[in-house]
Amino acid sequence: RDSSTSRGLGDVYKRQPVHRAFNTLIGLNSVRQMNTPEAWSSGVPAFGGVASARGMAQFYQACLGLDELRVFPSAVRGWMRNVVIDGPDLTLKTPTAFSCGFMHDPADPATGRKLRHLFGSGGFGHAGAGGSHAFADPAHGLSFGYAMNRMDLNVLPGVKTRNLISAVMKEVAEECF
């Protein structure tokens, strides 16, 4: 391999938005560093939501308004559900859709059909580091939380997580009919 070519590609990568997004100022340069109390409390934007699967599911029950305390007012729950941006994500290099604070399944602009099925029918949530995933599905009154014991290195949920989501949604669909 030509070292000048390698160096040139590295320089190109460093100018990309994805490099800035995934290389923080405090230097979390490995998966192992992410799983420490110091990293969790560092206050890095878009990082640090540490919870159990049960805790994530309970949070999304609150997002649906199905919690005992009614933490989120109806208007706020509307902001969670309504997509405000849907299109190409220049950082992740894939289509994404977001409401205020939550991911949604992106839609094909030509047909309106979902490009991915990660959040249920009209659902919203967030993919987490390493394959963890959580969401609320308002159509079924369902909240879902999945925390991995061993990190998957995909940016979006990998095959294992997607298969689990598919199995849950299939079961929910069968229960409703």
Regions found by a protein language model. Name each.
Residues 18-126, 174:
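Conserved active-site loop region of the serine DD-peptidase/beta-lactamase
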Residues 8, 101, 128-131:
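Glycine-centered small-residue hotspots that permit tight backbone geometry or close packing
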Residues 1, 45, 130:
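Generic anion/oxyanion-binding catalytic loop in active/binding sites
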Residues 127-177:
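Structured C-terminal helix/loop/strand segments within mature extracytoplasmic catalytic/sensor domains
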Residues 1-13:
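Single conserved hydrophobic/aromatic residue that forms the stacking wall/gate
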Residues 2, 86-89, 137:
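Acidic side chains
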Residues 12, 53, 154-155:
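Loop/helix-junction capping segments adjacent to catalytic residues or to phosphate/diphosphate-binding pockets
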